[in-house]
UniProtKB/Swiss-Prot annotation:
It comes from the Archaea. One of its GO terms (molecular function) is nucleotide binding. It comes from Methanothermobacter thermautotrophicus (strain ATCC 29096 / DSM 1053 / JCM 10044 / NBRC 100330 / Delta H) (Methanobacterium thermoautotrophicum). Binds 1 Mg(2+) ion per subunit. Keywords: Flavoprotein, FMN, Kinase, Magnesium, Metal-binding, Nucleotide-binding, Transferase. Catalyzes the CTP-dependent phosphorylation of riboflavin (vitamin B2) to form flavin mononucleotide (FMN). It is an enzyme of class 2 (transferase). The keyword Ribosomal protein does not apply. This is Riboflavin kinase. CDP binds at residues 4-9, 97-100. Pfam families: CTP-dep_RFKase.
Length: 122
């Protein structure tokens, strides 16, 4: 994992997304994302394919999402903003808690994700 641009907090707190996060993810995300580097960008594309969508609006782009479990402990979701500055091998994870504090994470730490495929369309 690595530090990001600090933009996640801004976008997550926009009402156009926040209301849908509550409805579709079942939680109110902590304002910020955990950026997870994945060695193979093709893995990211496979996870992203068929992911449900959170509609943007008012100049904000759509966001695809997949529910996941981080380190076997924290339920959250991987977000795939259709407008992003991140390279393809980076996942953005959100959860209802501050993940760095809750899991005592630092840049360079390795994390695991268990993907919930129940909402992915084939």
């Amino acid at each position: 994992m690595k530090s990001g641009f600090g933009e996640g907090a801004y976008f997550i707190t926009r009402s156009v997304y926040r209301d849908q996060f509550r409805e579709k993810l079942g939680f109110d995300p902590f304002p910020g994302t955990l950026n997870i580097e994945v060695g193979d960008p093709e893995i990211v594309e496979r996870i992203r394919e068929g992911a449900p969508v959170i509609q943007g609006g008012g100049g904000f782009g759509d966001v695809l999402y997949v529910k996941a479990l981080l380190n076997g402990v924290v339920e959250g979701a991987i977000l795939f903003p259709l407008k992003t500055h991140h390279r393809q091998g980076c996942l953005e994870f959100v959860a209802p808690v501050n993940l760095r504090k809750t899991l005592k994470l630092r840049d360079g730490d390795t994390v695991s994700l268990d993907i919930d495929t129940s909402e992915i369309q084939e």
